[in-house]
Amino acid sequence: MGKKIWLFAALWFISVGCSSEGEIYMTEVNNLWGKNDAKKIEFEIKDSQSPKNLIFVVRNNNEYPYNNLFLISTIKGEKNKVLKTDTLQYILAKPNGEWYGSGIGDVKEILVQYKNEYKFPANGKYKVELKHGMRTDQLKGIEDIGIKIENIKTTTP
C-alpha cells in the first residue's frame, strides 16, 4: 500500500511539473525562512509576445503559525534589471484554522494568483525574488515556494 502512495505522489508531481498549461519552478525553504533571505526562482521566457498568468505556489506545514502570508516579490530581467516589485498578502487558512490548498499529510500546497496576463518585455532569462514580509525574523512552516507560469490561450475569431 505504501509503495502505491509514493508512486501516486511521484506521478502527481511529474504531471504538475510538466503540465501543458504551464511550468512550475520551485525553490526550497526547508521550514525556516529568514526575513532577509531572498528566495530566487530563475526561468526562461521563450515567447514574450504571449501574455502569461503568474501564480505563486506555496507549500506549508502545520508549524506555520499564521493564517496569512505577506510576500515581497521582485521580477528581474537581464542584468538584474528590476521590472516590477510588489508587496502582497495571501490568506492560507480559513478562520477556523483549516488550511486552504491540497496535500497529503501535514504539508499543504496552495496556488495563489500573482499577475494576470503579464507580458514579459523580451525573450530571455528572468528571475523572481521572494522575501517574506511577516513580523518575525525567522518564519517557520514554509517548506517550498515557487511560481507557475501559464501561457494564456488566445482564440482567434
What is each stretch, according to the model?
Residues 40-68:
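Post-signal-peptide N-terminal segment of Sec-exported extracytoplasmic proteins
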Residues 61-63, 108-119, 132-140:
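Short acidic/polar inter-strand loop motif in beta-rich domains
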Residues 88-119:
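An anionic, turn-rich surface loop/hairpin at beta-sheet edges
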Residues 121-136, 141-151:
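Internal, hydrophobic beta-strand segments that form the core of beta-sheet-rich folds
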